[in-house]
């Protein structure tokens, strides 16, 4: 019944950031040649002699369909003979989790490792036992069991063989693609994609392009949360840094909705920049911003920094040059109800940096409405207050009684903001790692226009006092480097930043920090350079 089949020797498909598909062991022909037993569909070397541990279902693979470019799901139907143990119900959990057996248990999608034992497979002596179960293994015969496993299975009623019908739904994406795609020099298959809402985004090498529709359909089939699979093309829009892409499976729908940092973002994925791998970095930076401060987001995109910061209670200037990004940032501002604390603009980043300090001073934000909470939150806070009073009373500490709280109709205001928002920027964000460093010259003299404002001079008691006392903003500049060692990366980044800022930036500058964000490619890392803007730069006189 069994046919001669290939062994899948491909790495797993990995979806980032949300989930990981099962891994298939990578075995080379040389490793097979060194096995003490012949390698067939089920035949395995004893565990103690195998150099490489196999995944639970590594000895079962789909039929080889190498070279096919169109997906035929019926081509993966297969009848497989497997070894199973007839076990009493009370023993099943103990045997399944036993160290000598757990790696032998059948592990295939939509195939149960434990099933009811058919009457025809139960031994005659045990047919009166109710509820017999079959514990299935990924082996075909008893001789393939390691000695330790045989010893443990002496507690089973019998070892039997059964035939299981497997099909397309029983194989994961790695196994299907491994059975279809030809071997390459690197012996790999398309290994990763990112998810953005309902869209799976792949970056296929040229050698896989003839198979792109098959690859896309398999990935779509095996990930029910996706509706669209796209492949990034080589064309990149230099000004706005987004890629052209092609739908290779599913709906031709680029309008994605993503939930991140407690906010909802909707945008057209085909003409704006969004990277789902950066959500932890977004959260890290936003955590540095106290509520009530002013943030200037120079390259805000659709708002991954600006929207959560505004929702947190910061006052945000969100700017981008891409009209589509600005359109969706405005839409997301409405969706997340942060209109009072997010001001959106569409100008060049160089100009935005130059005018932002004066903009905030001369046109400060209106005070934001106080944050509100529901009655449920109000009740939780009241219970917490009572608990603290009871603890104080038990400890013999004086207790101040408060008047009963009035019950509002729906919501109550808590912890109001300061009555007047700040008129100075606390943080600049420059999230365009490919070129943000080249925008640093715009900070030279960006505070000088404030010296012409009488209110600014009066606030600090004179021009020189203002230069000395005004609080300088933090600058967070994202960038790439080809240097992999962190020491060399720091030298490279600081040299380029110093040149563009016309100021010698060193690790000794105020509030300096260099944060490694992620590795983008084998010789390309992303960093966030943070420092407090030097007064000598901000107030420098041109000419």
From Swiss-Prot:
Gene giving rise to this polypeptide: TRM5
Ligand binding (S-adenosyl-L-methionine): 282, 320-321, 348-349, 431
One Gene Ontology term of the molecular function aspect: tRNA methyltransferase activity
UniProtKB keywords: Cytoplasm, Methyltransferase, Mitochondrion, Nucleus, S-adenosyl-L-methionine, Transferase, Transit peptide, tRNA processing
GO CC annotation terms, alphabetical: cytoplasm; mitochondrial matrix; nucleus
Species in which this protein is naturally found: Cryptococcus neoformans var. neoformans serotype D (strain JEC21 / ATCC MYA-565)
Protein name: tRNA (guanine(37)-N(1))-methyltransferase
Pfam families referenced in this protein's UniProt entry, alphabetically: TRM5-TYW2_MTfase (PF02475), TYW2_N_2 (PF25133)
UniProt subunit comment: Monomer.
InterPro entries: MeTrfase_TRM5/TYW2 (IPR030382), SAM-dependent_MTases_sf (IPR029063), TRM5-TYW2-like_MTfase (IPR056743), TRM5/TYW2-like_N (IPR056744), tRNA_Gua_MeTrfase_euk (IPR025792)
Transit peptide, residues from-to: 1-59
HAMAP family, per the entry: TRM5
């Amino acid at each position: 019944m069994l046919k001669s089949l290939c062994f899948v020797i491909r790495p797993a498909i990995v979806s980032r950031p949300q989930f990981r598909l099962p891994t298939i062991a990578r075995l080379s022909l040389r490793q097979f040649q060194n096995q003490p037993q012949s390698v067939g569909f089920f035949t395995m070397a004893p565990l103690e002699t195998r150099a490489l541990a196999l995944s639970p279902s590594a000895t079962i693979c789909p039929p080889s369909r190498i070279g096919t470019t169109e997906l035929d799901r019926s081509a993966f139907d297969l009848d497989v003979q497997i070894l199973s143990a007839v076990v009493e119900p009370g023993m099943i959990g103990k045997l399944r989790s036993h160290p000598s057996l757990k790696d032998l248990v059948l592990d295939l999608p939509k195939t149960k490792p434990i099933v009811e034992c058919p009457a025809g497979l139960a031994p005659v002596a045990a047919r009166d036992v109710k509820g017999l179960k079959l514990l299935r293994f990924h082996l075909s015969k008893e001789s393939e069991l390691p000695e330790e496993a045989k010893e443990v299975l002496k507690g089973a009623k019998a070892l039997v063989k059964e035939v299981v019908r497997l099909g397309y739904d029983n194989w994961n994406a790695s196994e299907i693609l491994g059975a279809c795609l030809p071997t390459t020099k690197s012996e790999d298959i398309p290994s990763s994609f990112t998810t953005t809402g309902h869209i799976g985004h792949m970056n296929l090498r040229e050698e896989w392009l003839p198979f792109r529709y098959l690859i896309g359909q398999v990935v779509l089939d095996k990930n029910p949360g996706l509706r669209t699979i796209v492949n990034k093309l080589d064309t990149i829009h230099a000004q706005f840094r987004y890629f052209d892409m092609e739908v290779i499976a599913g709906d031709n729908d680029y309008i994605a909705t993503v939930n991140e940092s407690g906010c909802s973002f909707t945008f057209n994925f085909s003409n704006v920049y969004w990277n789902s791998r950066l959500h932890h970095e977004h959260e890290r930076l936003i955590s540095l911003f106290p509520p009530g401060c002013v943030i200037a987001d120079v390259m805000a995109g659709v708002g991954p920094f600006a929207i959560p910061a505004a929702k947190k209670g910061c006052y945000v200037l969100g700017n981008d040059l891409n009209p589509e990004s600005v359109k969706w940032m405005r839409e997301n501002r409405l969706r997340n109800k942060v209109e009072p604390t997010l001001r959106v603009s569409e100008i060049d980043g160089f100009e935005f940096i130059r005018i932002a300090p004066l903009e905030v001073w001369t046109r400060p934000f209106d005070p934001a409405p106080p944050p509100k909470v529901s009655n449920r939150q109000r009740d939780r806070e009241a219970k917490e207050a009572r608990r603290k009073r009871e603890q104080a009373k038990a400890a013999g500490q004086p207790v101040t009684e408060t008047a009963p709280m009035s019950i509002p109709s729906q919501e109550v205001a808590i912890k109001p903001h300061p009555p007047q928002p700040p008129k100075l920027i606390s943080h600049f964000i420059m999230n365009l790692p490919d070129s943000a460093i080249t925008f640093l010259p715009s900070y030279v003299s960006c505070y000088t226009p404030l010296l012409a404002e009488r209110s600014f001079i009066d606030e600090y008691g004179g021009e020189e006092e203002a230069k000395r006392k005004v609080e300088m903003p933090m600058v967070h500049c994202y960038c790439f480097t080809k240097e992999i060692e962190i020491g060399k990366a720091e030298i490279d980044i600081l040299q380029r930043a110093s040149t563009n800022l016309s100021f010698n930036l060193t690790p000794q500058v105020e509030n300096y920090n260099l944060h490694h964000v992620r590795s983008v490619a084998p010789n390309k890392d992303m960093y966030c350079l943070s420092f407090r803007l030097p007064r000598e730069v901000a107030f420098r006189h041109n000419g």
